[in-house]
């Protein structure tokens, strides 16, 4: 944290295919993040990653084939705000894998309606391939009960609308225990 606790940043040089998996290429990726803390509970953030990916399978969304090293770049800007018992967050992101451009945006609102009980709503848009317009939108509404710090019971309904595939609806429940 720098400048009177108003700025956070991170920068890294990375190499790897994932946890416990040897990297299949020699290139390094660079990544960075910058957070600006404004007016107490308002945050504006930006991040990026620039590097090379190694395809472990053929892509469903573009012409990247198994074993191919390809350009993998991402950037995002976002903001979050908390006021009393309400928290909101939104983020916009773009990516480029080889020559395929993608984009996404989401918004999330969480509001405490009773002690330890919160309502959650979100909208999530993803365009996996801007050229073919491979788009999906997810609408999510739910409730969660925090029965212990970092432990919750959650239920939510999701409606997923796909442009190139069928739509879907999901009703799910989750128990989260963290220590």
Task: Describe each PLM feature range.
Residues 26-30, 71-75, 101-105, 135-139, ...:
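Residues that define the transmembrane beta-barrel architecture of outer-membrane proteins
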Residues 5-9, 40-45, 85-90, 116-120, ...:
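Repeated loop/turn-to-beta-strand initiation elements of outer-membrane beta-barrel proteins
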Residues 33-35, 76-80, 108-110, 142, ...:
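Outer-membrane beta-barrel architecture
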Residues 1-43, 47:
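Aromatic- and glycine-enriched pocket-lining scaffold segments that form the walls
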